[in-house]
């Protein structure tokens, strides 16, 4: 931004990204204009919470005179709208930081990504990215903000903008701390100057704000702390509305947990399980790092998102935790190191995992919905929360070769139906169920009726190998070359003789060169000519791909190519070798078989050579007819 003139009224330019953001909001949120009021009320409530907290902890802050409240005034004839709070107010620096710049890094990029994917920027997203104030430009062309900070020595200030690239700030005579926002509604949005419309919106979005909201002299909201009331008194409708209020989610929660603990530490909580993963989790790496339920101390909000209440893998849980065992002037650092917080976190984590277990047993469909949305996040706890590791393992669900698509099996269920002579739990990882089922490495297991877990979630390759064993049975990838396939069912077709197989495998090795670790006879294949497997100490294919995606500098692991001596293609290659071992089609076919195996496991980086050789082989086949 740049200061253009040094007069009583200072004019500033928005940064380029701020202009783009305003354009996105105004032109992409037109289907939900009413959310401007929800955002203005939310900002006013935050200002009041900060003022209340500061009054208790900072003697230098001015004390708010009169009632801590939000007041809305309307004029239907002139389409005038104003909302005022007696909160903490803003200094000039805070006006510039809060209203003149993008509130959070990455916000513009996130919204542009949604726009490119033709996803609607609904009101559900606005409050989550610190841009709620700017939604006011959907309903007006010009906004005035009058404010005075509660900080000692502060002056009254007026901020104005039309959202077109600049804004102004000037000093005014304002006696009391707080903020007033006023504007004239556009003709197409004059409905928001009608009392019935405003009352409906407040009831819909802001009924549970901690402070009274007045329309002129009428209070519109019912202030109630649901977590302080017994669960038996709560109605599902008010629980749903409270969830929508604190989470900015338009959907109802999937389920909720009411907690009341008395003992070494005492606290009450109400926690919510969303139906869907918030959109930002898909677009922002590390988004859960600073998430968490709201923390209240003696009914006063201390932190809007307290990351210390839950481990990171559970921070998608929304809700409120209220305790009297912390002091009101608790700092961020004290919260982090407080033994009270550690105990609350420990108890909450145990209760939430117990909640998930109960859902899995009593409401499996609801659990399936939860697991589909948040399973990948919960799995991360296996590598970070060793105290609850056993509980997390029992929550794991997988598709398998014996389940339908979208159906799950637990490790306990898998182990219970293992054959008596099966010593290990087998899994196979890849990009998706269809690709996994098409992999030749499954043929032996399917032929023997051995169940294999299908791991298509990218995080699986990091967390599942760390389990090592379950119920004294090792978890083993089917790619590993040390699996015993001695009892494989032999193909009805007679395999080529060893004296022919040995020289053919030598030609395979010479043709593929350093790109392969070895070429060996396969005992696992039933109906495919070749397959690729990892060496005993090598990473499996999915792990290699994940490391590449993370741009980790890892040496490319060489695979072992297994050859099925009973397959017609291998038998035909043997015949061609006997006739003329210098026949170029032998090498072409070998390359094609190798790259075909790479293609099946998703590891073929370029298809150019593959297609070229395919055309060459088709040409040779058609010439021989």
Curated annotation (Swiss-Prot):
GO terms for cellular component: cytoplasm. The keyword Transmembrane helix does not apply. SUPFAM superfamilies: ATPase domain of HSP90 chaperone/DNA topoisomerase II/histidine kinase, HSP90 C-terminal domain, Ribosomal protein S5 domain 2-like. Residues 546-625 are annotated as: C. It is found in: Cytoplasm. InterPro entries: HATPase_C_sf (IPR036890), HSP90_C (IPR037196), Hsp90_fam (IPR001404), Hsp90_N (IPR020575), Ribosomal_Su5_D2-typ_SF (IPR020568). Its main location: cytoplasm. GO terms for molecular function: ATP binding; ATP hydrolysis activity; ATP-dependent protein folding chaperone; unfolded protein binding. Residues 333-545 are annotated as: B. Keywords: ATP-binding, Chaperone, Cytoplasm, Nucleotide-binding, Stress response. Residues 1-332 are annotated as: A. Homodimer. Molecular chaperone. Has ATPase activity. Belongs to the heat shock protein 90 family. This is Chaperone protein HtpG. The gene is htpG.
């Amino acid at each position: 931004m740049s200061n253009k003139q040094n007069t009583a009224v200072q004019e500033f330019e928005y940064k380029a990204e701020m202009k783009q953001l305003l354009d996105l909001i105004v032109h992409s949120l037109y289907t939900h204009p009413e959310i401007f009021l929800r955002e203005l009320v939310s900002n006013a409530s935050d200002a009041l919470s900060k003022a209340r907290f500061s009054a208790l902890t900072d003697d230098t802050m001015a004390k708010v005179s009169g009632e801590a409240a939000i007041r809305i005034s309307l004029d239907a004839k002139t389409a005038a709208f104003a909302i005022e709070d007696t909160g903490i107010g803003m200094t000039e620096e805070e006006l510039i930081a809060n209203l003149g710049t993008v509130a959070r890094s990455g916000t513009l990029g996130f919204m542009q990504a949604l726009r490119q994917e033709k996803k609607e920027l609904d009101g559900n997203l606005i409050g989550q990215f610190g841009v709620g104030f700017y939604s006011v430009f959907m309903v007006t062309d010009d906004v005035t903000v009058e404010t005075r900070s509660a900080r000692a020595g502060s002056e009254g200030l007026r901020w104005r903008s039309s959202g077109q690239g600049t804004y102004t700030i000037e000093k005014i005579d304002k006696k009391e701390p707080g903020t007033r926002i006023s504007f004239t509604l556009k003709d197409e949005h004059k409905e928001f100057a009608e009392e019935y419309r405003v009352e409906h919106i407040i009831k819909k979005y802001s009924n549970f704000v901690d402070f009274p909201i007045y329309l002129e002299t009428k209070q519109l909201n019912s202030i109630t702390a649901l977590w302080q009331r017994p669960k038996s008194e709560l109605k599902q409708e008010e629980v749903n509305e409270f969830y929508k209020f604190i989470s900015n989610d338009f959907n109802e929660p999937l389920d909720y947990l009411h907690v009341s603990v008395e003992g070494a530490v005492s606290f009450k909580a109400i926690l919510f399980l969303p139906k869907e993963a918030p959109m930002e989790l898909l677009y922002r790496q590390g988004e859960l790092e600073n998430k968490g339920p709201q923390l209240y101390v003696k009914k006063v909000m201390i932190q809007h998102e307290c990351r210390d209440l839950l481990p990171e893998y559970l921070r998608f849980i929304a809700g409120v935790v209220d305790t009297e065992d912390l002091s009101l002037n608790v700092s961020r650092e004290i919260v982090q190191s407080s033994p009270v917080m550690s105990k609350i976190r420990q108890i909450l984590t145990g209760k939430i995992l117990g909640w998930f277990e109960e859902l899995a047993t009593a409401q499996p469909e609801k659990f399936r919905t939860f697991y589909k949305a948040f399973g990948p996040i919960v799995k991360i706890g296996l590598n970070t929360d060793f105290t609850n590791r056993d509980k997390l393992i029992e929550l794991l669900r997988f598709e398998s070769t014996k389940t339908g698509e979208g159906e799950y099996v637990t490790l306990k269920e898998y182990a219970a139906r293992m054959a008596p002579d099966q010593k290990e739990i087998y899994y196979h990882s890849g990009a998706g169920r269809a690709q996994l089922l098409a992999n030749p490495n499954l043929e032996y297991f399917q032929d023997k009726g051995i169940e294999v877990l299908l791991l298509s979630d990218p995080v699986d390759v990091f967390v599942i190998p760390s389990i090592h064993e379950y119920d004294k049975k090792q978890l083993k990838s089917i790619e590993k070359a040390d699996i015993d396939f001695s009892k494989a069912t032999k193909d009805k077709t007679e395999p080529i003789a060893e004296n022919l197989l040995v020289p053919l495998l030598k030609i395979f090795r010479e043709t593929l060169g350093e790109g392969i670790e070895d070429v060996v006879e396969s005992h696992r294949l039933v109906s495919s000519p070749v397959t690729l497997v990892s060496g005993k100490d090598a990473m499996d294919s999915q792990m290699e791909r994940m490391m590449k995606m993370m741009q980790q500098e890892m040496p490319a692991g060489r695979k072992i190519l297994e050859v099925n001596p009973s397959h017609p293609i291998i038998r035909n290659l043997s015949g061609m070798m006997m006739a003329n071992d210098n026949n170029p089609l032998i090498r072409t076919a070998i390359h094609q078989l190798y790259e075909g195996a790479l293609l099946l496991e998703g590891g073929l980086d370029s298809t150019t050579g593959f297609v070229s050789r395919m055309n060459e082989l088709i040409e040779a086949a058609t010439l021989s007819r």
